[in-house]
Amino acid sequence: MKYDIIGDIHGCLQEFQNLTEKLGYNWSSGLPVHPDQRKLAFVGDITDRGPHSLRMIEIVWELVIHKKEAYYAPGNHCNKLYRFFLGRNVTVAHGLETTVAEYEALPSHKQNMIKEKFITLYEQSPLYHVLDEKRLLVCHAGIRQDYIGRQDKKVQTFVLYGDITGEKHADGSPVRRDWAKEYKGTTWIVYGHTPVKEPRFVNHTVNIDTGAVFGGRLTALRYPEMETVSVPSSLPFVPEKFRPIS
């Protein structure tokens, strides 16, 4: 099986359409379909900050749940939206407010439909996907070699948020360790979460979050070819979001 793994979309629907078309997908059915049966995989954070979060929920639900033609690993923004839809007490900030504004503008029957689709998508998707006979792992923020196969709370925190130290940068964002430098496994770990200006290959890991929602690019990794394909963002460039990893 061949896969096209898509970085953090964050509601950037036009960029997602442009990228999938560049990868050879046809949208005539209303969904991206590849003539060679390649499968899409998503590293999570499909919503928040960008303009079309709800449409991205519908598309990913159709591909993953309804048609079973794609793979989705939830990100930290997905986790927060899931908790919001469950009625938990979450702070509607850091991008969630854009998704909530879209949601609250809908009539109640459409709200219920979106809520049910996203809850189903989240609950029926694993924390990470192990594919191609354990040669490939798709997740949101990365995973340590000794965590592969585990689903406990410690692993969940790592996979959703990265290797956080508990400290904060001046802007309030968490300080993260560079786990990829220590990774010694042979399974390719493909992930996003931390915006980088260029796809970052370190050992057998690839960060493909090139900051589409911050004016960078939306990037895919073609597997097993190990080629990256990107399209430019239509949004303003926010340079401070592309922090050096250390």
Curated annotation (Swiss-Prot):
One of its GO terms (cellular component) is cytoplasm. SUPFAM superfamilies: Metallo-dependent phosphatases. Disulfide bonds: none annotated. Its EC number is 3.6.1.17. It catalyses: P(1),P(4)-bis(5'-guanosyl) tetraphosphate + H2O = GMP + GTP + 2 H(+). One of its GO terms (molecular function) is GTP binding. CDD domains: MPP_Prp_like. Belongs to the PrpE family. This is Bis(5'-nucleosyl)-tetraphosphatase PrpE [asymmetrical].
